[in-house]
Amino acid sequence: MKAVVIDQKLTYNLLKNLRTKISNILRATSVLAFFCAILILIGCNKHDNPESNPKNSSYNYSIPEEKQDGWPVTSVEDVGVDKVLLEEAISKIVDGDFVNISSILIARDGQLIVDELFRTTLDANDAAVRNTDLNVHTMQSTTKSFASALIGIAIDKGFINSVDVSFYTLFPEYNRFENWSDSKNDITLENVLTMQHGWHYNEWDYPMESDQNTLFFIYSNYSDFVKGLLDLPMSSEPGNSFAYATMASHALGAAISGKSNKSVPDFAQEYLFGPLQFDTVYWLFSPTNRAMTGCCLFISGRDMTKFGQLYLDKGRWNGEQIISSKWIEKSVTKAVDLNFGFTDGYGYQWWMKEFTVDGQSIEAFFAAGNGGQFIYVFPSLNVVIS
Protein backbone atom coordinates (compact mmCIF):
# COMPACT_ATOMS: atom_id res chain seq x y z
CA MET A 1 0.00 0.00 0.00
CA LYS A 2 1.34 3.43 -0.92
CA ALA A 3 0.03 6.88 -0.02
CA VAL A 4 1.17 9.87 -2.02
CA VAL A 5 1.00 13.49 -0.88
CA ILE A 6 0.67 15.83 -3.83
CA ASP A 7 1.16 19.57 -4.24
CA GLN A 8 -1.62 22.07 -4.84
CA LYS A 9 -1.07 22.39 -8.59
CA LEU A 10 -1.24 18.65 -9.06
CA THR A 11 -4.29 18.47 -6.80
CA TYR A 12 -6.00 21.00 -9.02
CA ASN A 13 -5.18 19.12 -12.22
CA LEU A 14 -6.53 15.90 -10.76
CA LEU A 15 -9.72 17.55 -9.52
CA LYS A 16 -10.16 19.17 -12.91
CA ASN A 17 -9.92 15.78 -14.57
CA LEU A 18 -12.23 14.35 -11.92
CA ARG A 19 -15.11 16.78 -12.55
CA THR A 20 -17.81 14.51 -13.86
CA LYS A 21 -20.50 16.02 -16.05
CA ILE A 22 -23.45 13.80 -16.82
CA SER A 23 -22.68 14.00 -20.54
CA ASN A 24 -19.22 12.53 -19.93
CA ILE A 25 -20.69 9.67 -17.93
CA LEU A 26 -23.29 9.05 -20.60
CA ARG A 27 -20.68 8.81 -23.34
CA ALA A 28 -18.58 6.35 -21.37
CA THR A 29 -21.58 4.43 -20.08
CA SER A 30 -23.13 4.04 -23.53
CA VAL A 31 -20.09 2.00 -24.54
CA LEU A 32 -20.04 -0.12 -21.42
CA ALA A 33 -23.81 -0.50 -21.30
CA PHE A 34 -23.73 -1.86 -24.84
CA PHE A 35 -20.91 -4.19 -23.91
CA CYS A 36 -22.80 -5.26 -20.79
CA ALA A 37 -25.81 -6.03 -22.98
CA ILE A 38 -23.63 -8.25 -25.18
CA LEU A 39 -22.34 -10.04 -22.11
CA ILE A 40 -25.85 -10.48 -20.78
CA LEU A 41 -26.76 -12.12 -24.06
CA ILE A 42 -23.68 -14.32 -23.75
CA GLY A 43 -24.93 -15.46 -20.38
CA CYS A 44 -28.45 -16.11 -21.56
CA ASN A 45 -28.01 -17.54 -25.06
CA LYS A 46 -25.83 -20.15 -26.69
CA HIS A 47 -24.15 -19.64 -30.04
CA ASP A 48 -25.58 -21.78 -32.84
CA ASN A 49 -22.18 -23.30 -33.55
CA PRO A 50 -19.93 -23.12 -30.48
CA GLU A 51 -17.12 -24.91 -32.29
CA SER A 52 -16.81 -22.22 -34.93
CA ASN A 53 -14.46 -19.26 -34.72
CA PRO A 54 -15.62 -15.66 -35.17
CA LYS A 55 -14.98 -14.45 -38.68
CA ASN A 56 -11.76 -12.42 -38.82
CA SER A 57 -11.60 -12.40 -35.03
CA SER A 58 -8.71 -10.37 -33.65
CA TYR A 59 -9.07 -11.80 -30.16
CA ASN A 60 -8.63 -15.35 -28.93
CA TYR A 61 -9.87 -16.17 -25.45
CA SER A 62 -7.61 -17.61 -22.75
CA ILE A 63 -8.30 -18.42 -19.10
CA PRO A 64 -7.09 -15.69 -16.70
CA GLU A 65 -3.75 -16.20 -15.03
CA GLU A 66 -3.97 -17.90 -11.65
CA LYS A 67 -2.34 -15.71 -9.02
CA GLN A 68 -2.09 -15.92 -5.26
CA ASP A 69 -4.64 -13.14 -4.84
CA GLY A 70 -7.72 -15.05 -3.72
CA TRP A 71 -9.32 -15.28 -7.16
CA PRO A 72 -10.30 -18.74 -8.40
CA VAL A 73 -10.10 -18.77 -12.20
CA THR A 74 -11.90 -20.89 -14.74
CA SER A 75 -12.93 -21.00 -18.39
CA VAL A 76 -15.97 -19.12 -19.65
CA GLU A 77 -17.41 -22.41 -20.88
CA ASP A 78 -17.32 -23.84 -17.35
CA VAL A 79 -19.82 -21.19 -16.21
CA GLY A 80 -22.11 -21.33 -19.23
CA VAL A 81 -20.72 -18.42 -21.23
CA ASP A 82 -20.43 -18.80 -24.99
CA LYS A 83 -16.75 -18.36 -25.90
CA VAL A 84 -17.45 -17.51 -29.54
CA LEU A 85 -19.78 -14.63 -28.69
CA LEU A 86 -17.35 -13.42 -26.05
CA GLU A 87 -14.52 -13.38 -28.58
CA GLU A 88 -16.70 -11.45 -31.00
CA ALA A 89 -17.48 -8.87 -28.32
CA ILE A 90 -13.91 -8.37 -27.13
CA SER A 91 -12.69 -8.21 -30.73
CA LYS A 92 -14.66 -4.97 -31.02
CA ILE A 93 -12.41 -3.47 -28.35
CA VAL A 94 -9.22 -4.85 -29.93
CA ASP A 95 -10.29 -3.53 -33.34
CA GLY A 96 -10.96 -0.05 -31.98
CA ASP A 97 -14.74 -0.04 -32.29
CA PHE A 98 -14.79 0.99 -28.63
CA VAL A 99 -12.05 3.37 -27.55
CA ASN A 100 -10.58 4.30 -24.18
CA ILE A 101 -11.24 0.91 -22.61
CA SER A 102 -8.12 0.07 -20.61
CA SER A 103 -9.19 -3.37 -19.44
CA ILE A 104 -12.16 -5.69 -19.06
CA LEU A 105 -12.63 -8.23 -16.29
CA ILE A 106 -15.57 -10.56 -15.78
CA ALA A 107 -16.40 -12.84 -12.87
CA ARG A 108 -19.25 -15.32 -12.86
CA ASP A 109 -20.34 -17.66 -10.09
CA GLY A 110 -17.52 -16.32 -7.92
CA GLN A 111 -14.77 -17.17 -10.42
CA LEU A 112 -12.71 -14.89 -12.62
CA ILE A 113 -13.30 -15.83 -16.25
CA VAL A 114 -11.96 -12.83 -18.20
CA ASP A 115 -8.95 -10.63 -17.40
CA GLU A 116 -7.82 -8.61 -20.40
CA LEU A 117 -5.59 -5.53 -20.42
CA PHE A 118 -5.69 -3.21 -23.43
CA ARG A 119 -3.82 -0.10 -22.43
CA THR A 120 -0.17 0.06 -23.43
CA THR A 121 0.97 3.38 -21.99
CA LEU A 122 0.84 5.16 -18.66
CA ASP A 123 -0.71 8.61 -18.28
CA ALA A 124 -0.59 11.71 -16.08
CA ASN A 125 -2.70 10.05 -13.40
CA ASP A 126 -0.11 7.30 -13.10
CA ALA A 127 2.66 9.87 -12.85
CA ALA A 128 0.86 11.52 -9.93
CA VAL A 129 1.33 8.40 -7.80
CA ARG A 130 4.49 7.19 -9.54
CA ASN A 131 2.66 4.11 -10.75
CA THR A 132 4.53 1.97 -13.27
CA ASP A 133 2.07 -0.94 -13.51
CA LEU A 134 -0.34 -0.85 -16.45
CA ASN A 135 -2.75 -3.04 -14.48
CA VAL A 136 -3.16 -0.37 -11.78
CA HIS A 137 -5.56 2.40 -12.70
CA THR A 138 -7.12 5.54 -11.29
CA MET A 139 -10.59 4.88 -9.88
CA GLN A 140 -11.78 8.49 -10.10
CA SER A 141 -15.27 8.66 -8.53
CA THR A 142 -15.51 4.89 -8.24
CA THR A 143 -13.57 5.69 -5.07
CA LYS A 144 -16.82 6.96 -3.56
CA SER A 145 -18.25 3.43 -3.38
CA PHE A 146 -15.14 2.34 -1.48
CA ALA A 147 -15.68 5.24 0.93
CA SER A 148 -19.20 3.96 1.53
CA ALA A 149 -17.85 0.49 2.28
CA LEU A 150 -15.43 1.95 4.82
CA ILE A 151 -18.29 3.84 6.50
CA GLY A 152 -20.21 0.57 6.72
CA ILE A 153 -17.24 -1.13 8.34
CA ALA A 154 -16.82 1.79 10.76
CA ILE A 155 -20.44 1.31 11.83
CA ASP A 156 -20.05 -2.48 12.01
CA LYS A 157 -16.99 -2.04 14.25
CA GLY A 158 -18.68 0.52 16.50
CA PHE A 159 -16.53 3.51 15.56
CA ILE A 160 -19.65 5.33 14.29
CA ASN A 161 -23.04 4.76 15.91
CA SER A 162 -25.31 4.65 12.86
CA VAL A 163 -26.27 6.43 9.66
CA ASP A 164 -28.71 8.50 11.72
CA VAL A 165 -25.94 10.40 13.49
CA SER A 166 -25.84 14.15 12.86
CA PHE A 167 -23.07 14.67 10.32
CA TYR A 168 -21.63 17.77 11.96
CA THR A 169 -21.11 15.92 15.24
CA LEU A 170 -18.55 13.75 13.46
CA PHE A 171 -16.20 16.75 13.28
CA PRO A 172 -15.69 18.07 16.83
CA GLU A 173 -12.34 19.59 15.82
CA TYR A 174 -14.23 22.52 14.27
CA ASN A 175 -15.86 25.02 16.61
CA ARG A 176 -17.27 27.50 14.10
CA PHE A 177 -18.90 27.27 10.69
CA GLU A 178 -19.76 29.89 8.10
CA ASN A 179 -23.32 30.25 6.80
CA TRP A 180 -24.71 28.51 9.84
CA SER A 181 -28.37 27.56 9.96
CA ASP A 182 -30.16 25.18 12.28
CA SER A 183 -30.97 22.89 9.35
CA LYS A 184 -27.31 21.91 9.29
CA ASN A 185 -27.94 20.07 12.55
CA ASP A 186 -30.45 17.95 10.67
CA ILE A 187 -27.97 16.63 8.08
CA THR A 188 -27.40 12.96 8.87
CA LEU A 189 -24.65 10.65 7.74
CA GLU A 190 -27.27 8.91 5.60
CA ASN A 191 -28.13 12.20 3.89
CA VAL A 192 -24.49 12.55 2.88
CA LEU A 193 -24.20 8.94 1.72
CA THR A 194 -27.22 9.40 -0.57
CA MET A 195 -26.15 12.88 -1.76
CA GLN A 196 -29.26 14.47 -0.23
CA HIS A 197 -27.28 16.66 2.15
CA GLY A 198 -28.99 19.97 1.40
CA TRP A 199 -25.86 22.09 0.90
CA HIS A 200 -25.78 24.57 -1.96
CA TYR A 201 -23.52 22.43 -4.12
CA ASN A 202 -23.11 22.05 -7.88
CA GLU A 203 -20.05 20.54 -9.56
CA TRP A 204 -21.74 19.29 -12.73
CA ASP A 205 -23.17 22.33 -14.48
CA TYR A 206 -20.29 24.83 -14.47
CA PRO A 207 -16.73 24.84 -15.84
CA MET A 208 -14.09 23.80 -13.34
CA GLU A 209 -12.59 27.30 -13.33
CA SER A 210 -15.89 28.93 -12.34
CA ASP A 211 -16.55 29.94 -8.74
CA GLN A 212 -20.08 28.67 -9.33
CA ASN A 213 -18.56 25.20 -9.52
CA THR A 214 -18.56 24.20 -5.86
CA LEU A 215 -15.68 21.77 -6.28
CA PHE A 216 -13.49 24.57 -7.66
CA PHE A 217 -14.76 27.08 -5.10
CA ILE A 218 -13.72 24.88 -2.18
CA TYR A 219 -10.40 24.01 -3.80
CA SER A 220 -9.63 27.69 -4.46
CA ASN A 221 -10.67 29.08 -1.09
CA TYR A 222 -9.82 26.35 1.41
CA SER A 223 -6.75 24.25 2.11
CA ASP A 224 -9.03 22.18 4.36
CA PHE A 225 -11.59 20.75 1.94
CA VAL A 226 -13.75 19.32 4.73
CA LYS A 227 -14.08 22.73 6.37
CA GLY A 228 -14.95 24.20 2.98
CA LEU A 229 -17.79 21.72 2.62
CA LEU A 230 -19.14 22.25 6.12
CA ASP A 231 -19.08 26.03 5.64
CA LEU A 232 -21.37 25.92 2.60
CA PRO A 233 -24.82 27.51 2.84
CA MET A 234 -27.91 25.33 2.67
CA SER A 235 -30.16 25.34 -0.38
CA SER A 236 -32.72 22.70 0.65
CA GLU A 237 -33.81 20.67 3.62
CA PRO A 238 -31.70 17.55 4.15
CA GLY A 239 -33.19 14.50 2.48
CA ASN A 240 -35.19 16.45 -0.10
CA SER A 241 -32.97 16.76 -3.18
CA PHE A 242 -30.00 15.09 -4.87
CA ALA A 243 -26.76 17.02 -5.38
CA TYR A 244 -23.69 15.04 -6.39
CA ALA A 245 -20.78 16.22 -4.25
CA THR A 246 -17.23 14.92 -4.41
CA MET A 247 -16.26 16.94 -1.35
CA ALA A 248 -19.04 15.25 0.65
CA SER A 249 -17.49 11.88 -0.17
CA HIS A 250 -14.10 13.29 0.83
CA ALA A 251 -15.59 14.23 4.20
CA LEU A 252 -16.71 10.62 4.71
CA GLY A 253 -13.06 9.61 4.89
CA ALA A 254 -12.33 12.39 7.36
CA ALA A 255 -15.18 11.15 9.56
CA ILE A 256 -13.74 7.63 9.54
CA SER A 257 -10.29 8.89 10.52
CA GLY A 258 -11.65 11.09 13.26
CA LYS A 259 -13.76 8.39 14.88
CA SER A 260 -11.29 5.51 14.50
CA ASN A 261 -8.04 7.41 15.15
CA LYS A 262 -6.63 5.70 12.07
CA SER A 263 -5.72 7.16 8.72
CA VAL A 264 -8.00 6.09 5.89
CA PRO A 265 -5.23 4.05 4.20
CA ASP A 266 -4.50 2.23 7.47
CA PHE A 267 -8.20 1.69 8.21
CA ALA A 268 -8.85 0.42 4.69
CA GLN A 269 -5.84 -1.87 4.74
CA GLU A 270 -6.80 -3.41 8.08
CA TYR A 271 -10.50 -3.93 7.48
CA LEU A 272 -11.03 -4.07 3.70
CA PHE A 273 -8.02 -4.19 1.41
CA GLY A 274 -6.04 -6.62 3.53
CA PRO A 275 -8.86 -9.17 3.88
CA LEU A 276 -9.54 -8.85 0.13
CA GLN A 277 -5.85 -9.47 -0.61
CA PHE A 278 -5.45 -6.28 -2.61
CA ASP A 279 -2.04 -6.07 -4.23
CA THR A 280 -1.04 -2.50 -5.08
CA VAL A 281 -2.95 0.43 -3.59
CA TYR A 282 -2.24 4.14 -4.00
CA TRP A 283 -4.05 7.03 -2.35
CA LEU A 284 -3.75 10.72 -3.11
CA PHE A 285 -3.92 13.11 -0.17
CA SER A 286 -5.40 16.58 0.24
CA PRO A 287 -3.31 19.57 1.42
CA THR A 288 -4.36 18.75 5.01
CA ASN A 289 -3.05 15.19 4.64
CA ARG A 290 -6.42 13.49 4.31
CA ALA A 291 -6.92 10.63 1.88
CA MET A 292 -9.14 11.87 -0.93
CA THR A 293 -12.01 9.42 -0.62
CA GLY A 294 -14.14 11.22 -3.17
CA CYS A 295 -11.87 10.57 -6.10
CA CYS A 296 -8.38 9.39 -5.69
CA LEU A 297 -7.84 5.68 -5.14
CA PHE A 298 -5.69 3.61 -7.51
CA ILE A 299 -5.99 -0.19 -7.67
CA SER A 300 -5.83 -3.02 -10.20
CA GLY A 301 -8.67 -4.38 -12.29
CA ARG A 302 -8.56 -7.69 -10.45
CA ASP A 303 -9.02 -5.87 -7.15
CA MET A 304 -11.83 -3.73 -8.57
CA THR A 305 -13.63 -6.91 -9.53
CA LYS A 306 -13.07 -8.39 -6.06
CA PHE A 307 -14.85 -5.38 -4.61
CA GLY A 308 -17.82 -5.99 -6.88
CA GLN A 309 -17.79 -9.68 -5.95
CA LEU A 310 -17.77 -8.71 -2.26
CA TYR A 311 -21.01 -6.80 -2.78
CA LEU A 312 -22.52 -9.54 -4.93
CA ASP A 313 -21.81 -12.00 -2.10
CA LYS A 314 -23.38 -9.69 0.50
CA GLY A 315 -20.14 -8.71 2.19
CA ARG A 316 -18.37 -12.07 2.19
CA TRP A 317 -15.04 -12.93 0.57
CA ASN A 318 -13.51 -16.40 0.76
CA GLY A 319 -15.70 -17.31 3.71
CA GLU A 320 -15.03 -14.16 5.74
CA GLN A 321 -17.76 -11.59 6.46
CA ILE A 322 -15.91 -8.35 5.77
CA ILE A 323 -18.93 -6.02 5.69
CA SER A 324 -22.32 -6.83 7.20
CA SER A 325 -24.92 -8.09 4.75
CA LYS A 326 -27.31 -5.48 6.15
CA TRP A 327 -24.95 -2.70 5.04
CA ILE A 328 -24.54 -4.20 1.59
CA GLU A 329 -28.29 -4.49 1.11
CA LYS A 330 -28.92 -0.92 2.24
CA SER A 331 -26.08 0.44 0.12
CA VAL A 332 -27.40 -0.97 -3.15
CA THR A 333 -31.07 -0.27 -2.47
CA LYS A 334 -32.39 2.77 -4.30
CA ALA A 335 -32.71 5.72 -1.91
CA VAL A 336 -33.11 8.37 -4.62
CA ASP A 337 -35.03 8.05 -7.88
CA LEU A 338 -33.04 9.55 -10.77
CA ASN A 339 -33.52 9.85 -14.51
CA PHE A 340 -30.09 10.65 -15.89
CA GLY A 341 -30.04 8.08 -18.69
CA PHE A 342 -27.06 6.19 -17.35
CA THR A 343 -28.83 5.55 -14.04
CA ASP A 344 -32.29 5.41 -12.52
CA GLY A 345 -31.30 5.62 -8.87
CA TYR A 346 -28.72 6.10 -6.15
CA GLY A 347 -28.04 4.36 -2.84
CA TYR A 348 -25.12 4.74 -0.44
CA GLN A 349 -22.59 6.01 -3.01
CA TRP A 350 -23.71 3.33 -5.50
CA TRP A 351 -25.73 3.82 -8.69
CA MET A 352 -28.61 1.61 -9.90
CA LYS A 353 -29.73 0.76 -13.42
CA GLU A 354 -32.34 -1.57 -14.90
CA PHE A 355 -31.38 -2.98 -18.31
CA THR A 356 -33.85 -4.50 -20.75
CA VAL A 357 -32.38 -7.10 -23.09
CA ASP A 358 -34.56 -9.20 -25.41
CA GLY A 359 -37.56 -8.21 -23.32
CA GLN A 360 -35.86 -9.39 -20.14
CA SER A 361 -35.40 -6.93 -17.28
CA ILE A 362 -32.03 -7.23 -15.57
CA GLU A 363 -31.19 -5.05 -12.57
CA ALA A 364 -27.67 -3.88 -11.83
CA PHE A 365 -25.90 -1.71 -9.31
CA PHE A 366 -22.59 -0.10 -10.11
CA ALA A 367 -19.74 2.15 -9.06
CA ALA A 368 -18.79 4.80 -11.62
CA GLY A 369 -15.95 7.21 -12.23
CA ASN A 370 -15.19 9.82 -14.85
CA GLY A 371 -13.38 8.45 -17.88
CA GLY A 372 -15.08 5.08 -17.80
CA GLN A 373 -14.12 3.50 -14.48
CA PHE A 374 -16.95 1.07 -13.69
CA ILE A 375 -17.80 -1.88 -11.50
CA TYR A 376 -21.10 -3.41 -12.65
CA VAL A 377 -22.82 -6.07 -10.56
CA PHE A 378 -25.68 -8.15 -11.99
CA PRO A 379 -27.11 -10.18 -9.08
CA SER A 380 -29.59 -12.21 -11.15
CA LEU A 381 -26.78 -13.36 -13.46
CA ASN A 382 -24.21 -13.79 -10.67
CA VAL A 383 -21.89 -11.62 -12.76
CA VAL A 384 -19.43 -8.80 -12.02
CA ILE A 385 -17.93 -6.72 -14.83
CA SER A 386 -15.24 -4.08 -14.36
Q: Predicted segment positions?
A:
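N-terminal secretory signal peptides that target proteins for export/translocation
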Residues: 1-26
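Active-site helix/loop module of the DD-peptidase/beta-lactamase fold
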Residues: 157-199, 231-234, 260-295, 299
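Active-site Gly/Thr loop motif
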Residues: 278, 332-384
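Active-site-proximal alpha-helical segments within enzyme catalytic domains
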Residues: 248-255, 295-317, 373-386
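Active-site SXXK
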Residues: 110, 133-163, 192, 252-256, ...
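N-terminal leader/targeting segments and the immediately adjacent pre-domain N-terminus
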Residues: 42-127, 155-161, 194, 223, ...
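A small/polar active-site loop signature that marks catalytic segments
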Residues: 202-285, 294
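Bacterial N-terminal signal peptides
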Residues: 30-40
